[in-house]
Regions:
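An acidic/histidine-cluster motif and surrounding catalytic segment
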Residues: 1-96, 100-266
């Protein structure tokens, strides 16, 4: 039984057509989220070309022998999309996880123009561009964006062609968790720019999922505590916006601490 199936949907009014060639949505079959995907797509058309990747999952299809838990299955799905996008000769692509929730603000022309301008400046660099996350540490990139040094959530990210090429050159068995090499940068397998928009334009609820059950217990406890503190396990706002403010304050405090330590050593 084939583990994957791509279903293509065509629109003619994609919001981010100037920045991305296609959107991919990772959907684990029979997880109850298909109707949610279609509801989102009935209101939001991120690009003219949208693919839904139907993933049967490692338990119901034959995949590589080391793919034996949810995080590895998700990595395999991302890589399947990277390969498909390269075969189609796409440049930048947006990948959404099937619990994504767009903000109405993504339709506002000022945000669309800001994103298009940034993606154009990034050109052919190896980068990811984050439309929404729970940021932890960030530093200013320009007036509309931040360098996201550490963040939570890879549910709505634009991936450059060069980034796809570089990731596909890594031995898949060495990629244990998608968040670890992108959001937390664990292992530093490759160097790339990770830029985030200054406000969240796409959300997800942070709940206890099959994927999170495989996290390190210490990391999971911290993440779930922070999610509950922000109340983003129940509703996306105002928790997401508050996390952007908290991250800004935390980053300033950390920067001031580092500067003070440097000054003391002079």
């Amino acid at each position: 039984m084939e583990p994957y199936k791509f279903t293509k949907i065509i629109f003619n009014d994609g919001l981010l057509n100037k920045s991305i060639d296609a959107t991919y949505i990772i959907h684990l079959e029979n997880n109850g989220r298909y109707e949610h995907i279609m509801e989102q797509l009935s209101e939001y058309h991120p690009s003219n070309i949208v693919y839904i990747l139907f993933n049967k999952g490692y338990k119901k299809s034959k995949k590589k022998s080391f793919i034996n838990k949810s995080p590895l299955d998700l990595v395999d799905a991302f890589l399947e999309i990277f390969k498909h996008a390269n075969e189609q000769n796409y440049n930048n692509i947006l990948i959404l996880e099937d619990d994504f929730i767009f903000s109405k603000k993504i339709k506002q022309i000022n945000h669309i123009n800001n994103i298009n301008m940034t993606i154009k400046k990034l050109g052919n660099d190896d980068f990811i561009y984050i439309l929404g996350c729970i940021p932890i540490i960030k530093i200013p990139y320009d007036c509309n964006n931040y360098n996201a040094l550490t963040f939570g959530g890879t549910h709505s990210i634009i991936y450059s062609k060069q980034h796809r090429i570089n990731i596909l050159n890594i031995n898949q068995a060495d990629i244990h968790d998608w968040d670890m090499i992108h959001a937390i940068r664990f292992g530093n397998m490759i160097n790339f720019k990770q830029i985030m928009y200054y406000k969240p334009l796409c959300y997800q609820l942070f709940t206890d999922t099959e994927n999170s059950k495989n996290w390190n217990l210490y990391i999971k406890d911290i993440c779930m505590f922070y999610a509950k503190l922000l109340n983003v396990h129940k509703q996306v706002e105002p928790g997401f916006s508050n996390s952007y403010l908290i991250s800004k304050i935390l980053s300033i405090v950390l920067f001031m601490f580092i500067i003070s330590r440097i000054i003391k050593k002079l």
